[in-house]
Amino acid sequence: MVDVRKLIEYNEEVRHRYFDSLAKLPWDELTKNREASFHSLRNIFIHTLGAVDYWLDFLLNEKLRTKREFDDYGTMDDLQKYMARVEVRMRTYAASLTPEGVLKEYEVTNDLGVATRVTAEDVLIHVFEEEVHHRGELIALLWQMGIEPPLMGWKYL
């Protein structure tokens, strides 16, 4: 059985590979509207960080997530700082999780408008898969640009 914290660590490791690849692109290529879910490579990357930030607020009953818009991130340094802030929050939360904490229940309204009971583990798995889905989108866009995406397989498989 995989510990959800291992999935979080994996996502962080792979996220850095993608950040490094995106950092090599000219800014106009990074921000170009490619008619994808959040239009540009930059926006998709920011969205995945925003999802982590949002769900950490939910799990921790905080209101610390950024209110910045995509265009407020004008440099790779801006992206790196946001990524670092979100990752510190996630690492701190994950390190504090006890076996009981992973099973803590919350009520959330799902995308169908239905109130649903979920555990912290459910939320963390959702955060993991949300980023993986959008990583697939980044892969497709990089391929369309003729760029080989970074390795992303679990344990380099």
Where are these regions (language model features)?
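Basic/polar N-terminal segments that are highly enriched at the extreme N-terminus
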Residues: 1-5
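A non-catalytic, amphipathic alpha-helix used as a structural packing/dimerization or gating element
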Residues: 6-17, 81-85, 89
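Short, contiguous alpha-helical
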Residues: 8-20, 24-71, 111-157
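Helix-adjacent hinge/juxtasegments
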Residues: 62-102
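A mid-sequence interfacial segment
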Residues: 90-125
